Amino acid sequence: VLSAQVNPSGRLPMTFPLDYRDHLSSENYPFDYTSKRSDWEYDAPERKIRNLGWTEYLEGVDVGYRYFCTKATEKISFPFGFGLSYTSFEWSDAALTRKGNDFRVTLRVTNTGDRPGREVVQLYASAPESELCKPVRELKAFAKTPVLSPGSSATLELTFSAYDLASFDESLSAFVSQEGTYTLQLNRDASTIVTTLPLTLKK
């Protein structure tokens, strides 16, 4: 990889912030707590223990990249889904089709560089405004090309359903696919939008 004999095509499964403390969950990890006495420690004094084995997530829907994309865009060093390549790609002919509650997005990817390589397309959805708490975008699908030689192309297909757009409504105790116009974002990573498509859901 370092000598460019192999072209990397992996993507980050997490967000790298500028500072560890930029993670919302850092407020809960690690922390000191007072241990509980057990039967065999009846006379043992209570003691402070440094918690390193688990953490408590209190972010709600803003776990991981959702928090950084929604509320901390300026704190990102490398975004979720980021990756490098020794070549370049052009995306074109994005289209959306629907069959019942199932959706399909197709996209043509062309290697415009001078080395063989693979490209990854990530499909995010941005929901219409509502009373439900939602992040600014959520990953719904992704696809990867085969190895493309310079100048060659491939058509990728990304599929998802209306249920994948649903959010939990506590007042109904159910997942609900909200009506309205969603923005489908075809991204290189969670922060880099290449093109968008509208999707309208009706009851």
Predicted regions mapped to residue ranges:
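Short, hydrophobic/aromatic beta-strand segments
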Residues: P116-L123, P135, F168-E170, T195
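Secreted, periplasmic, or luminal enzymes acting at the cell surface/secretory milieu
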Residues: V1-R118, Y124, E179-N187, K203
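Terminal connector regions
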Residues: S161-K203
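Intrinsic-disorder/low-complexity, polar/charged segments enriched in Ser/Thr/Lys/Arg/Asp/Glu/Gln
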Residues: D102-R104, S153-E157, V194-T196
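Short, solvent-exposed amphipathic alpha-helical segments in soluble enzyme
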Residues: Y124-S126, A174
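Intrinsically disordered, low-complexity Pro/Gly/Ser/Thr-rich segments with frequent PxxP/GP/PP motifs
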Residues: E131-L172
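Low-complexity, flexible helical/coil segments
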Residues: Y20-S26, F142-T145, L158-F160, S191-P198
